């Protein structure tokens, strides 16, 4: 074989290997997606209504329903594991869980240690008013926020006074909440945007085939998310 033919042969071999490599991407180093087809999906649950809701029986919540449907598409069933956020994400980091859900967003510092899907739902927060009300300036105004909602900090940063309530739907004054909830309450959303969160689901580090499959599933649900959240709140 002369030098020209040798170079051509090497080039053809390299291209063939490149094509073969691309055909098998993305990969799961720990073969998580392949394993899930043969066993229950180990799902870490972090309580965070309406995303994950603890009940006396089967767990409920928007992300619980999403993962239940995703598992069904893969021909398996979820195996639920309750715990705190750090505990669950540490287990995920060491491949003891396959997925962790709990209203996580892309602001989590755990992105250095575990994998995440692409953001699948953007949750925007505004100040809103009951029908017929008007608000010129939020500064100095009392604004109701449900207890435990971190958006209260954003309200205070605007110079408003936060009133913490159990249920914002019973308030007859300015309210700060997610847009999907304000719409459900039939409140009028003002131009006072407070925050915007991108929701994600956590997976083990490096398991790219699993992330791709889950991303594809979540993409098909993107237009349903607002309605799913409103339905979950209506069940309370």
Regions found by a protein language model. Name each.
Residues 1-22:
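Sec-dependent bacterial lipoprotein signal peptides
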Residues 42-46, 142-144, 175:
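Short, well-ordered beta-strand segments
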Residues 23-25, 61-73, 132-156, 195-236:
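Extended ligand-binding regions for polar small-molecule ligands
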Residues 102-113, 168-196:
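A ligand-binding cleft/hinge motif common to bilobed small-molecule-binding domains
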Residues 103-105, 130-133, 146-152, 178-182:
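Short, polar loop motifs at secondary-structure junctions
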Residues 70, 92-93, 168-171, 214:
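Hydrophobic residues within well-ordered alpha-helices
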Residues 40-47, 114-135, 201-204:
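Hydrophobic/proline-rich hinge and linker segments of small-molecule sensing/allosteric domains
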Residues 22-104, 109, 151, 162-163:
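Extracytoplasmic small-molecule ligand-binding "clamshell" domains
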């Amino acid at each position: 074989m002369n030098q020209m033919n040798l170079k051509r042969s090497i080039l053809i071999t390299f291209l063939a290997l490149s094509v073969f490599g691309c055909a098998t991407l993305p990969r799961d180093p720990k073969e998580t997606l392949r394993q899930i087809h043969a066993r229950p999906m180990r799902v870490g649950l972090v309580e965070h209504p309406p995303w994950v809701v603890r009940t006396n029986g089967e767990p409920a919540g928007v992300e619980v329903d999403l993962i239940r449907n995703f598992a069904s598409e893969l021909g398996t069933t979820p195996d639920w594991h309750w715990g705190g956020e750090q505990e669950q994400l540490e287990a995920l980091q060491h491949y003891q869980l396959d997925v962790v859900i709990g209203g996580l967003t892309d602001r989590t510092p755990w992105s250095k240690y575990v994998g995440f899907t692409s953001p699948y739902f953007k949750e925007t927060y505004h100040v809103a008013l009951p029908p017929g009300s008007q608000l010129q300036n939020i500064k100095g105004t009392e604004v109701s926020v449900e207890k435990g909602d971190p958006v209260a900090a954003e309200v205070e940063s605007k110079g408003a006074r936060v009133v913490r309530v159990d249920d914002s739907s019973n308030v007859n004054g300015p309210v700060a909440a997610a847009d999907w909830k304000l719409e459900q309450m039939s409140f009028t959303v003002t131009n006072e945007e407070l925050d915007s969160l991108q929701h994600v689901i956590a997976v083990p580090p490096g398991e790219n085939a699993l992330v791709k499959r889950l991303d594809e599933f979540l993409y098909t649900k993107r237009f349903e998310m607002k309605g799913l959240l409103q339905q979950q709140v209506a069940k309370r």
